[in-house]
């Protein structure tokens, strides 16, 4: 069973940007995609001030590997600090 997760951000204005993920996050996505552990790389959709990213993992084990990664934890901290400092609300949904 695949695991789909969605991150939804709502910015206070168009002048505010989302955080910049650590470079290692892109490497992890590529590696896990090439290994078949990610079946859909993150897809970004924008609707006004709302931005959504959706990623699909092959199974629960692949997702657990992802969330246990040091670079994912680094990204989580960076995202939280940036969103709090810039009044960006966000939620993580999944599995959906």
Q: Could you say what each language-model-derived stretch is?
A:
Residues 1-52, 56-70, 88-96:
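Short S/T/G/P-rich N-terminal loop/turn motif that feeds into the first structured element of a domain
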Residues 75-93:
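Conserved short beta-strand edge segments in small beta-sheet-based binding/regulatory domains
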């Amino acid at each position: 069973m695949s695991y789909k997760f969605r991150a939804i951000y709502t910015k206070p204005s168009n002048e505010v940007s989302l955080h910049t993920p650590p470079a290692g996050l892109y490497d992890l996505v590529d590696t896990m995609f090439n290994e078949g552990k990610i079946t859909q790389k993150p897809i970004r959709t924008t609707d006004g001030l709302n931005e959504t990213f959706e990623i699909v993992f092959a199974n629960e084990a692949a997702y657990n590997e992802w969330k246990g990664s040091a670079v994912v934890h680094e990204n989580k901290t960076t995202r939280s600090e940036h969103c709090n400092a810039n009044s960006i609300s966000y939620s993580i949904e999944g599995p959906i």
